[in-house]
Amino acid sequence: MKKMTSIAILGLLIAATGVAYAETLRAITVEQNASYALDTDSLVQSNGKTAFSVQTVFTSKMKAPNGAEYTKATNTFLADCKAKTQALTGVSLMDGSGKVVYSYNPTVTEAPMIAPERNSLDAKIMQTACGLK
């Protein structure tokens, strides 16, 4: 029931922004102060890897590295579903209106392909994305 309520809140928050979203979101999990959903429209496979993005909606304002406040995030990942590894390839943090207040694209050295810890948020994200490919 808690997950359904959080997913409903996620939907309301997205609708409340007044921005049209073309994504088809699939709930991943609700943890601490945020809801996580896979953008299934973002799934792209190439050379044995799967690229995808995850939308996050926070229940309270967060602070970006540059000091800006944000309530939403879009993180992009590259996963090797067979090897069970993934890497973070991009971060975009948005305020309540959907305006990007901070973005970051790590290098391969900064964010290498790694196997997420069992039952971690990253493991849940990869399991959801790889399960839909």
Feature-to-residue mapping (PLM):
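Cleavable N-terminal signal peptides
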Residues: 9-10, 20
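N-terminal secretory-pathway/extracellular module detecting exported/lumenal segments
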Residues: 19-74, 80-133
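N-terminal signal peptide c-region/cleavage motif recognized by signal peptidases
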Residues: 15-17
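Bacterial N-terminal signal peptides that target proteins for export
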Residues: 1-8
